[in-house]
Amino acid sequence: MGQKIHPTGFRLSVSRNWASRWYASNRDFAGMLAEDIKVREYLKAKLKNAAVSRILIERPAKNARITIFSARPGVVIGKKGEDIENLKKELATRLGVPVAVNIEEVRKPEIDAKLIADSITQQLEKRIMFRRAMKRAMQNAMRLGAQGIKIMSSGRLNGIEIARTEWYREGRVPLHTLRADIDYGTSEAKTTYGVIGVKVWVYKGDTLGRNDLPAAETPRPEEERRPRGPRRDGRPGDRAGAGRGGRRPMGTNAAPADGSDKPAGAGGDSVKRVKSAPAAAAADGKGE
């Protein structure tokens, strides 16, 4: 039974890039990775209402540069930039190095997998029917240019006693194609019945490299039937004239006109002898 690999990890260094871009020695690697995880958890809780899609962390030369991709950058910046200044101070205290914070706006949140999953979980927490939330998100994504989308919800859907999984798909979602730009996001809805998990796959088209350039579509060559090579027994390999409308070549292998088992050309001499023989000899031959 096939299982689904993580689409982002499957495409790293092919069509996707890492969310943490820095180099560290073996001694410092684990500590810096733990710092990145804590920073992401802090920003996720702090900017819960800012529609944060992803967080990019870079560490150039004893500094840190954090890029926040958000659909609502005004909420992150705050009035006159007060919130972002407080955010810089808090992050510098946690990391122990000077931190530069950049805000990038997500132009189309309707086709961002993480934002779609967060939107569905917020609706589930407000007791909206899960099918309605999923289908509405799929319609918005397809309307704004997504080539395919798949949404899966798991848990006690509608408060039923036994947990189950339901998923819907529209368009194409080629998970095995490495050049396919698959955006993947997850989220959890904490309801009174328990936790409901939501997974979203969005197919945005093919890419060339990590620059997210659309791949050039190569036209498929029309299927042409190639002529066969020479046969081992010396007969011609091309069957162009051997169809229903073609004529069979008259040779040693042609069928005889009288329907006998012998080839037509093999019994030419015997036919002449039968014609020149007297009638009595022919009758004796038939009796034998």
Curated annotation (Swiss-Prot):
Residues 39-107 form the KH type-2 domain. Residues 219-238 have a biased composition (Basic and acidic residues). GO terms for biological process: translation. Residues 209-288 are annotated as: Disordered. The keyword Disulfide bond does not apply. Gene3D superfamilies: 3.30.300.20, Ribosomal protein S3, C-terminal domain (3.30.1140.32). Residues 277-288 have a biased composition (Low complexity). PROSITE patterns: KH_TYPE_2, RIBOSOMAL_S3. Keywords: Ribonucleoprotein, Ribosomal protein, RNA-binding, rRNA-binding. Part of the 30S ribosomal subunit. Forms a tight complex with proteins S10 and S14. This is Small ribosomal subunit protein uS3. The lineage of its organism: Bacteria, Pseudomonadati, Pseudomonadota, Betaproteobacteria, Burkholderiales.
